Amino acid sequence: NDHRKFLCKDQVLRVESTSTAWTSGFEAGQEISIVLKNQDGQYVADAKTLEALEAEGRVVFRYVGFNPNGSRNDIAGITNERGNVVGLMPHPEHATEPGFGPSSSGFGSVSLRGGADGLGVFTSVLSNLINAR
């Protein structure tokens, strides 16, 4: 990343595409909060690749408000052409249980309503697997 320091923080992402197996349970434009744990890495690509990804709707998550690692175009996650593989920097697996993930109720408080925004990634793929039978 562009600062070479370990970050562990709640991160707001915008769902850019719901056409993948991993994002079909979200709404396009929905903002979710999941955990970012990152020291190494950022999304980099040349202008032609970025243009193609954007035109093809293959950017699936984008950082909102704060780009923690200097990723080009604020990209937090992309998908392959088929939409069955998603690469994502933040960690949705750390935001799957109410009261343990990021909370919209503020620092130091426990909210049983917050903290599970990452669960949508896994329920999306589970739903797609069940429907593929």
Question: What role is predicted for each listed range?
Answer:
Residues 1-133:
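Amide-donor transfer/coupling interface in amidating biosynthetic enzymes
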